[in-house]
Amino acid sequence: FLSFLSVIILTALGRGIQLRYFPGLTEGLKGVFLALPQFCVLVGCAAAAVLLGLYDDKHSMKAWKKLIGQILIAAVTATWGGVSITLFIGIPLVSWCITVFWFVFIFNAVNFFDNMDGLAVGTATIAFIFFACAAAVNGQYFVASLAALSAGSAAGFWLYNRAPASIFMGDSGSHFLGYLLAVVS
């Protein structure tokens, strides 16, 4: 949280003050400044996924309405979030469609797995650990950090979600977990 806050403060201070008083910090934050709009899109879409799940938990949405919400969240992420599956495909529209399909697939896969105590969270924890290792080996440290933090959070939740469960994720939790898995993968 403090690092995110420092980025906001340094952005507000302006480039001249940054270069004069924080030259090393400013050089290290160049990538953060460039990725901040995409990061905000990812955070906003994650919040939208949680809200979609909360609404479904409270009002039992029809499947097609939930699917439309999932497609919209995935489309915004694929368009402005900087997340895309290329698979060596040179056609951006095909890559975009595959990315949207992947997000919707992962949303629903995690939601489907959430029918037994600890299954969805345990599976997600293991997946996050592997994604963190793969990203770290490939030098993608932001993705590795996000996956490692998600693995730790999911493992902590799993302790209370395993049989006999004392807390449950619901659709809001499974949508958030599915969104994180789709982003990290």
Regions found by a protein language model. Give the residues of each.
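"…together with the soluble PPM/PP2C metallo-phosphatase catalytic core" -> "…together
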Residues: 1-185
